[in-house]
């Protein structure tokens, strides 16, 4: 959507969402990432003062970036203006929050370890799926497929670790970035990067 927030919602047949529905692609977000560019004419006002451009949408529509993100299940957006100016504190916070609203939001709901078997229940609290797969716990790969965690749902992943060594042991989990040079993929859970960068600390096993 190259006019995101401006011509996204269903206030005109030629807008992005109606076009998706007409092409029978309105459910494509479940398998393929949706993205686009915030319409250049609203990039500044949507960051500086969102209320000032609410009535600036196409065909009488209102500008609501967050509503457009939720409706399209957008995973990424381009806002060039935000990177070509100096943002004050509230503007930067607003920009970061809008970015955080896009895509997946993985969080560990609970975990347990029994006789070396680790189970991790992961929730997706975002607006879109995680489109790549691959997880590791220590030296064990967890079963399951991150791409199959539906939005608002949870799924349990499990893997077998070597026999528990004596003493307390810290259990970590990470999502492997499919891009060799990509940034670590992070959970929105307390304990992220606590022990090692890129890893979520789940907890410690009981002392034997």
Spans of model-derived segments:
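Serine/threonine-rich low-complexity intrinsically disordered regions
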Residues: 10, 21, 64, 88-90, ...
């Amino acid at each position: 959507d190259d006019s995101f927030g401006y011509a996204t919602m269903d206030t005109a047949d030629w807008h992005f969402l109606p076009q998706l529905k007409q092409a029978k692609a309105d459910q494509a977000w479940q398998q393929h990432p949706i993205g686009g560019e915030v319409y250049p004419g609203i990039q500044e006002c949507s960051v500086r003062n969102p209320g000032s451009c609410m009535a600036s949408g196409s065909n009488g529509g209102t500008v609501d970036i967050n509503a457009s993100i939720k409706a399209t299940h957008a995973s990424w957006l381009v806002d060039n203006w935000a990177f070509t100016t100096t943002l004050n504190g509230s503007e930067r916070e607003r920009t970061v929050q809008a970015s955080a609203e896009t895509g997946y939001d993985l969080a560990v709901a609970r975990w347990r370890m029994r006789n070396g078997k680790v189970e991790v229940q992961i929730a997706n609290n975002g607006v879109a799926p995680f489109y790549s797969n691959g997880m590791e716990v220590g030296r064990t790969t967890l079963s399951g497929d991150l791409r199959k965690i539906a939005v608002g749902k949870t799924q349990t992943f499990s893997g077998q670790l070597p026999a528990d060594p004596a003493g307390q042991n810290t259990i970590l989990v990470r999502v492997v970035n499919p891009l060799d040079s990509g940034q670590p993929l992070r959970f929105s859970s307390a304990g992220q990067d606590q022990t090692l960068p890129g890893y979520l600390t789940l907890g410690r096993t009981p002392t034997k």
